[in-house]
Design a protein with these regions (language model features):
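Alpha-helical interface subdomain recognition
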Residues: 1-123
């Protein structure tokens, strides 16, 4: 029986694909803003880090659930991807740091409006 014949599995994998594509766009934007040394590069990097961590964690959780009990064993490589997702969360500042960085920038109005895709009211 093909795995795609199970609708619940299809939905879980579709959610993972959406999260990965969302993260990919943020990572590309962050890489571009760092390469060009734009003013909002710190914001773009924080948004990319948060999106990538969320996508990696979601993908590893769904993978574990889709594989079932065999996903908990060392016979499959699911445990490796879980550990990589967890280590990504801890590397280069955790989610708390990046959320606080974004929140303080929004509250202090130090983040350029263009970072969120909006045209500044002052422009």
């Amino acid at each position: 029986v093909p795995i795609g014949s199970f609708q619940a599995v299809k939905h879980m994998l579709a959610d993972v694909k959406v999260a990965l594509e969302y993260a990919r766009s943020h990572v590309y934007r962050a890489a571009n803003s760092v390469a060009r040394a734009t003013e909002g590069r710190a914001v773009d990097v924080s948004m990319a880090k948060l999106a990538a961590c969320e996508a990696a964690n979601r993908a590893s959780r769904v993978s574990l659930q889709v594989h079932g009990a065999i996903g908990y064993t060392y016979e499959q490589d699911v445990h490796i991807w879980m550990k990589r997702a967890w280590s990504l969360e801890a590397a280069f500042g955790n989610s708390v740091f990046h959320n606080q960085r974004l929140a303080s920038g929004v509250i202090d109005r130090t983040i350029p409006a263009q970072s969120f895709g909006y045209i500044s009211a002052e422009a």
